[in-house]
Amino acid sequence: MSWRQVILLSSLSALVLLCMLQEGTSASVGSRQAAGEEVQEGMKQKIFMQESDASNFLKRRGKRSPKSRDEVTAENRQKLRDDELRREYYEEQRNEFENFVEEQRDEQEERTREAVEQWRQWHYDGLYPSYLYNRQNI
C-alpha cells in the first residue's frame, strides 16, 4: 500500500466515525431535554410551595403573639453563644495587652538598671567600696 492509500483510508474511516457520533449525540439530546424539563419541574416544586402553605407559613405567628418555647430556647442559645464568643475575644485581647505591657515594663526596667549602673561606674572615685557593698541597712 502506498502512503496515499493509507491517508485516504484513515480520513474516510474518521469521517464515517464522526458522522455516526453526531447522529448519536443528536438523538440523546432530545431525551436529555425532556429529562431536563422534568428536573426543572421537580426543582420548582422543591423551591416554591403552594399558595395556601405560604399564607399559613406567614400567618403562623403574629407580631404580638408569644413565641414558642423552642423559639425562645433557640434565641437564648444564640445569645449565650454570642456572649461566650465576645467574652473569649475580649479576654484574648486583654491577655495580649497585658503581655505587651509586661514586656515594655521589663525592657524599661532593664534600660533604667543599665543607666544607673553606668552612672555609678562613671562617678565612682575608687575611695569607697562600690555601691553594692556600701548600702545602709535600716
UniProtKB/Swiss-Prot annotation:
State where composition is biased (Basic and acidic residues). 67-85
Recorded coiled-coil stretches: 78-122
Query: Pro-region residues?
Result: 28-64
| Annotated segments matching region Disordered | 58-85
Signal peptide (from-to): 1-27
Molecular function GO terms recorded: BMP binding
Q: Where in the cell is it found?
A: Secreted, Extracellular space, Extracellular matrix
List UniProt keywords, sorted A-Z: Coiled coil, Extracellular matrix, Secreted, Signal, Sulfation
Pfam families xrefs = UCMA
Question: Where is it expressed, tissue-wise?
Answer: Detected in immature, proliferating, mature, columnar and hypertrophic chondrocytes from ribs, tail, vertebra and femur.
Post-translational modifications? Proteolytically cleaved by a furin-like convertase to generate a persistent C-terminal fragment found in almost the entire cartilage matrix, and affecting osteoblast differentiation.
Main location per the UniProt record: secreted
Q: Name one GO biological process term.
A: negative regulation of SMAD protein signal transduction
Q: Which terms in the GO cellular component ontology are assigned?
A: cytoplasm; extracellular matrix; extracellular region
Function noted in UniProt: May be involved in the negative control of osteogenic differentiation of osteochondrogenic precursor cells in peripheral zones of fetal cartilage and at the cartilage-bone interface.
Family per record:
Belongs to the UCMA family.
Q: What is this protein called?
A: Unique cartilage matrix-associated protein
Q: Which organism is it from?
A: Rattus norvegicus
